[in-house]
Structure formats: C-alpha cells, structure tokens
C-alpha cells in the first residue's frame, strides 16, 4: 500500500535520491552542483556526551557563568557547527538538574550547519544541551538535496526533528532562480513523521501568488500522508478545457483514497473521480467510482433521456485467505454505451467494445481445486447486440500425478448461459473431461502421450424464435462425447559456434505433434462462448482450434515445427526463429455451417506460422510474426517491429500490423466484422520515436497510417522541458474514437495536454518520455 506522492505544496524538505541513467543522471548531476554536501566525518552517538570545541581570535569570560568569543568564532560539537563574528556563551545551573544549561548567542555573519541543513543570518541562538537553534532574518539550504529558502525566524527543535519557519519560503530551484516557491506565515516540518503543517500557504510562480490556503497539512516524504497532488490540465475537442486537482487521503495503514475533481468545460460540470484502495485478510483491491451529475453535451445528443447522470464503477480484487480460499473480482460497469467514447479512462476504452463483470470464489488444496464464478458483459453497440453471461459457472480440477509412470487429471464444468435478449437460446452445459498422460523427458528431449474423453451435455431452452427463423434447428437436449489422442515430441540439439562466433551457442529444437479428435456434428448446439483462437507458432500445437467448449473441431493432423536459438557467452538469447505447419489428413470441422471454411473440403498443409526475434546489438532489436491460413486463402495476420534504443530516452521504433478481412470475419463477432472500418481488414504502418533535441528538451511522437483507408489511425506529438526545479510537458494527440454509420467515416478526437511538474521533490529526473509513449491509444511496447 506504499504510495509515493509528488504533492503540489509538499515542498518544504524533500528527499532527493537521484537516478543514474542517461540524461536523467546528467540532469541530476547538474542540479547537485549548486547543492552543498556534508564533507566532515559523520559522528554517531549521544551528542550530549560529545565534547564542545571552541576556536576564536579572542576570548574573555567570567568562569563558570559566561564567556565572550570574538573574531572568527568556530564552535563544533558532533555534527553541528556554529560560526559567527561574536559568540556569547552562558552557563546556568538549573535547580534539580545535574548538568548546567549552556546557551549561545551569536552575532554577525552567523553560520550554522550540520548533516541536514545550513542556516545563515545576522543573529542566532542555540541551546547546546537540547541542540535547539534559532536564526533570525536569514537563509537556509538543505544539505545533499535540493531545497532552500528564507524566513524571518528559522528554528531547529527536537534534536533536529522539527524545522519551524516563521514567514518562511521554500523552493527546490537552484540559487539564482526562484521560478516557483511556497510561502507560509508559519511552517512546521516534522522529519520523523514526514509531514509539514503550513498556515496561510501561498504558492507563487516568480513573484506572483497563484494559490492560497489558510491551512495545509502536506506529506513531505515517502510516508503516506493526506494532501493535494500535482494538478493537471489539457484541452480536447470532445471536452474542451479540462482540469484535474487530485487529493490523496490516507485513511488508515491498510486503506487510502484519491479524490479528483475533474472539470470539463464543454460538459458544463465537474466529474468526481474517486479511487479507493484497500488491503485486508481476504486480499487487496481497488474500487473506482466516477460520477458526473449532468452532461449538457449528452443531453443535447440524447434529448429523450433528459438529465442523465453519467458514471463508472470499477472493482478489482484478488486475495487468498487461510491458504486455500481464492477471491477474485474484475467488474466494470458504466452508465451508457457512449461513456468510453466521451471520457478517457484507464479502466476501459472505446475500442474494447464491452465491459466485463466477473466474480469468482475458489478453493484449492493439494491435487484439487474448485471455482464458482459469474461472468457478464456490458456490450457497447448501437445495434443492440445480444451477449451471453455465465450465471453461475463451476469449474473443478482433480490431479493425481505419478500414478506409476502416468499423470491423471479430471476436469469438470457446469454452467448456465443467459442471454440479454428474451428471444435468444439459453442453456445449461455440463462437461466432464478425464485425462491420462505418459510424460517422458530428459535433458535433450521430451515425449508426452495423452488421451482424454470429452463428454458434454446441453439442456437448451427458449428455442422457439431461433428455430422459426433458421434452417438449422437447435435441439432441447444434446449429448456430445468425443475422445482425443495426442502425441507430442520435442528434441533439443546444441552446438558450439566457435568457428563463427566464439563463446556463442546454437540450439535446434524440432517438434512434432499428432492430434486425433473424431468428428461430431455440433449444429444442434448454439455457440454460447466459443471463438477462433489465433494461430501463432505456439498456437499451432494447441489441442483446440476454438476457445470455449461449444465448438470442438475434429482433428486428424500432424503439426511440425522447428525453433533455432543463439545464445551469447553470457547465456543471453540473441536470436531465435520458429516456423511450423499443420498438415490435415481430413477436414477439420464442427458441423456449423456459419463457419466459412467448413464449407470447403480442404486437406493438406493448411496453416503456417512463424515467429522471429533478433537482438542485433545492444541497441537494435527486431521482432516479427506471420500466420498463413489456406482456408482463408490469405495471410491471416502478420506484424513486425524494428527498434533502435540508445537509452530510456532515445529510441526509434518502426511497426507494421496486418489482419486480413477474412481473418476478422472469422474471429470477431458479426457486429465488428461487418463494420465499415473493419471490412477491408487492418493494414497499418507506424513509427514511434523519443529523442532529446537540445539541452533539457525532449520530443516524443507516434504516427500510424492505415493503408486500406489511406487515413491516419493515430497521431501523437509531445514536447517536454526539464530543469532542476520544474518540468513542462505539452502534448497533442489525434486518435480514432469511433465510426459514424450515417456518414460512413471515422470519428477522431483531438487532445492537447499541458502539465507542470515540480522537480527536486522526488527521485525521478527522467524526461517522462516512456510515460507519454505508453499513454498513446496504440501504446509503445519494447522490441528489445
């Protein structure tokens, strides 16, 4: 539950542990040039037990009551040092105290320093017993970290635990620059609790105050403390000017919340974004409730709905209790289907098409586990498309390995499917799947022989409307029993590449799998949860062509593949390439005429797939993959990515993405596959780049172009300036945000973002380029 908080006004005394990577390290080093360091040996132990050393040009006194030192006075005790033109030492025996009270008055060019702070002023006072120190009308500077300011009176109390400023100011900017500062009539900073209390707080940019609060209690370190976080602002075409002012609330050691008023000018209201985190015996989780009381844009577009409250609720939970119980929640629900088109949210996207609402409770012990779950979908589609929910679903697994040379498993499932429409089929499905396998392996190969029986019973209801409108009739009660047999063998050959590359090693890994599943006509079963699985190289060796249990395709096939890898002398993989195919002895089918290729009687080498990775050097990397399906008569999908990465702030990446229209029609639901934006498939080229362009300036950008539509799919450009005491980030993004069916063209959203970050308050001196790239609608993913 630990949370780092870069607060707006939590600037009094902040720890700065600098990173040492790329430009961030250079900037951190530059910022430290104006920061003093503690170069004397660090003294440990009780300060009162340490001797006091006084050096001066002249001294006179009335022993043991007082003494006066003048001329280059230098007093040291432990890690503390006091220098002045004149120092008056007073010693009084307090009644009932074994030790006398020793105080010091310092006059002229007073300089106090220890391993945490430097105080300078014309007049000072110190208690040598308690180490309490006062300096009037002076300056202070943090030692070993950014932070300086002025005050009418500066106090050190509680063995340097507290710093108290009267009419004081603070900035993390280096000397000679007061770009921003915070001023308070009184400031009390508690180093131990890492909190600052500020009365009459004014935040200033240059000499101009822009924010005022009569009282603030702010976090000033890594401890979780309630307080305002750094605000943010941006401009978008869908919401115009937007402003965020988050507030962090440390409720308890095991729970906290972030409350963010989010003003949207075009919507004419404030959305309240409320994030709550918790940690308890049953697990950890996060809840988000976003609420917009009214939306004048939505009301104009949907006048029949009146004054619409718009909201989002998200709940994620994962936990284990008593080592055997498992609890999981993944729940997202919004007020309407346009929510993710109108508002940016990290809990969903307009391109997702639906929101998932899943609850599960599991029980697991050795050799056995069981899970009860419910799963629903909120579909965002104007065509009022139906969807199925599992209410409820029971999954059971029993394992018994090392039964002689065999491993055994029994998997069972019972689920009830309910549709969002009243006239669609519904069903109860019970599935039992016993498996026995014989695994054999050694260091150079493996052979796994497996046999299983898949028995499924369907009890289907509400079939009248469907059977009346379709030539293929569904049956009330269906039993499907299918055996499966599989043999999977793999070898690993290894050789030293001493002749070509000394120290390098190459492997050759051939793999062969035979799979047999007899054909069963499944046309009398409605498809409740099955969809085609993508066939990359690893996918060639799956047992199933479809996910779910409603469609289990017949198989009489051999899958062959080979992988070769190259490792350097440090055992780092530098290169690999895999290629494989599925050879069908008989047609793979389910009896479902709605599946296009089942109408074609094709056998032979139907599916090919290949993947490759090449780490060309420490700075260059290449990944690519291609899948070809003769049943679709086309390349199904392909992708490639070439990246140059000098460090975390300097990178260029070129990308290509392709999905054939036949593949989309075969894999996506009909309301997507027939949509205008997908009917020609996906064929995109793009580039992502991040590069410093001048001292402390950096630029990032992303551009993706769809060659089918001859239009850009996504564009992003960001510019950031980074200094020791602040960073400014400006970004522009134009992204696809839907499709206008009436006008038959894409809808784009233009967004301009503006963010200011105060520096010197945390350990991060990076340029922020990675964050900007990953926030893109087509987020950056490393190829290295």
Swiss-Prot record:
Residues 1-24 form the signal peptide. It is found in: Cell outer membrane. It comes from the Bacteria. InterPro entries: LipoPS_assembly_LptD, LptD, LptD_C, OstA-like_N. Contains two intramolecular disulfide bonds. Disulfide bonds join 31-724, 173-725. GO terms for biological process: Gram-negative-bacterium-type cell outer membrane assembly; lipopolysaccharide transport. Keywords: Cell outer membrane, Disulfide bond, Membrane, Signal. Its main location: membrane. Pfam families: LptD, LptD_N. GO terms for cellular component: cell outer membrane; transporter complex. Component of the lipopolysaccharide transport and assembly complex. Interacts with LptE and LptA. Together with LptE, is involved in the assembly of lipopolysaccharide (LPS) at the surface of the outer membrane. NCBIfam families: PRK03761.1. Belongs to the LptD family. This is LPS-assembly protein LptD.
């Amino acid at each position: 539950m630990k949370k780092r908080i870069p607060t707006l006004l939590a600037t009094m005394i902040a720890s700065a542990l600098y990173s040492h990577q790329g430009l961030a390290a250079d900037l951190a080093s530059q910022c430290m040039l104006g920061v003093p360091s503690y170069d004397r040996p660090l003294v440990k132990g009780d300060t009162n037990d340490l001797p006091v050393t006084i050096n001066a040009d002249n001294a006179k006194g009335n022993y043991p009551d007082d003494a006066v030192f003048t001329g280059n006075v230098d007093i040291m005790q432990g890690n503390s040092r006091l220098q002045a033109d004149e120092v008056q030492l007073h010693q009084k025996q307090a009644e009932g105290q074994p030790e006398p009270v020793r105080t010091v008055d310092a006059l002229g060019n007073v300089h106090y320093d220890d391993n945490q702070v430097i105080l300078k002023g014309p007049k000072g006072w110190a208690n040598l017993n308690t180490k309490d120190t006062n300096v009037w009308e002076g300056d202070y500077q943090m030692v070993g970290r950014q932070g300086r300011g002025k005050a009418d009176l500066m106090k050190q109390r509680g063995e340097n635990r507290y710093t108290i400023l009267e009419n004081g100011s603070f900035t993390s900017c280096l000397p000679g620059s007061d770009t921003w500062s915070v001023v308070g009539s009184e400031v009390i900073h508690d180093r131990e609790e890492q909190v600052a209390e500020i009365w009459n707080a004014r935040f200033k940019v240059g000499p101009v105050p822009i924010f005022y609060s009569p009282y603030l209690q702010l976090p000033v370190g890594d401890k979780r403390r309630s307080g305002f976080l750094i605000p943010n602002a941006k401009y978008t075409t869908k919401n115009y000017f937007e402003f965020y002012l988050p507030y962090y609330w440390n409720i308890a050691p095991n729970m906290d919340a972030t409350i963010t008023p989010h003003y949207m000018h075009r919507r004419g209201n404030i959305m309240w974004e409320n994030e709550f985190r918790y940690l308890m015996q049953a697990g950890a989780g996060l809840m988000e409730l976003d609420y917009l009381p009214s939306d004048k844009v939505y009301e104009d577009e949907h006048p029949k709905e009146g004054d619409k409250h718009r909201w989002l609720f998200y709940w994620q939970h994962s936990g284990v209790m008593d080592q055997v119980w498992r609890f999981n929640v993944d729940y997202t629900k919004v007020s309407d289907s346009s929510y993710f088109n109108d508002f940016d949210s990290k809990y969903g996207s307009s391109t997702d098409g639906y929101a998932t609402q899943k609850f599960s409770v599991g029980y697991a012990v050795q050799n056995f586990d069981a899970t009860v779950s419910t799963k629903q979908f909120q579909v965002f589609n104007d065509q009022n498309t139906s969807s199925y929910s599992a209410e409820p679903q029971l999954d059971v697994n029993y394992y018994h390995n090392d039964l002689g040379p065999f491993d055994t498993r029994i998997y069972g499932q019972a689920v009830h499917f309910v549709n969002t429409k009243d006239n669609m089929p519904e069903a109860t499905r019970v599935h039992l799947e016993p498996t026995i396998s014989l695994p054999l392996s050694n260091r150079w190969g493996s052979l796994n022989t497996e046999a299983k029986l898949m028995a499924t019973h369907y009890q289907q209801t509400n079939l009248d409307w469907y059977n009346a409108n379709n030539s293929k009739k569904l049956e009330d009660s269906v039993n499907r029993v299918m055996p499966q047999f599989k043999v999977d063998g793999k070898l690993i050959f290894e050789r030293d590449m001493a002749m070509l590359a000394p120290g390098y090693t190459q492997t050759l890994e051939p793999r062969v799998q035979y799979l047999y599943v007899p054909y069963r006509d499944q046309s009398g079963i409605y498809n409740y949860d099955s969809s085609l699985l993508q066939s990359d190289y690893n996918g060639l060796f799956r047992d199933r062509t479809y996910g779910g249990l409603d469609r289990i395709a017949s198989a009489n096939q051999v899958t062959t593949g080979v992988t070769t890898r190259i490792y350097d002398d440090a055992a780092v993989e530098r290169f690999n390439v895999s290629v494989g195919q599925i050879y069908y002895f008989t047609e793979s089918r389910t009896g479902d005429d709605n599946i296009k290729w089942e109408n074609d009687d094709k056998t032979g080498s139907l599916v090919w797939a290949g993947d490759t990775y090449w780490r060309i050097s420490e700075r260059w990397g290449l990944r690519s993959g291609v899948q070809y399906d003769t049943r679709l008569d086309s390349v199904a999908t392909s992708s490639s990515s070439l990246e140059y990465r000098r460090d975390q702030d300097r990178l260029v990446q070129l990308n290509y993405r392709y999905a054939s229209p036949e593949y989309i029609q075969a894999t996506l639901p009909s309301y997507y596959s027939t949509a205008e934006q997908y009917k020609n498939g996906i064929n995109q080229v793009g580039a992502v780049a991040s590069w410093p362009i001048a001292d402390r300036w950096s630029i990032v950008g992303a551009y993706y172009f769809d060659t089918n539509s001859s239009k850009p799919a996504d564009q992003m450009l960001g510019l950031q300036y980074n200094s020791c005491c602040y960073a400014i980030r400006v970004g522009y993004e134009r992204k696809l945000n839907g499709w206008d069916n009436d006008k038959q063209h894409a809808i784009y959203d233009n967004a301009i973002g503006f963010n200011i970050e105060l520096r010197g308050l945390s350990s991060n001196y990076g340029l922020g380029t990675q964050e900007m790239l990953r926030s893109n609608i087509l987020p950056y993913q490393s190829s290295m």
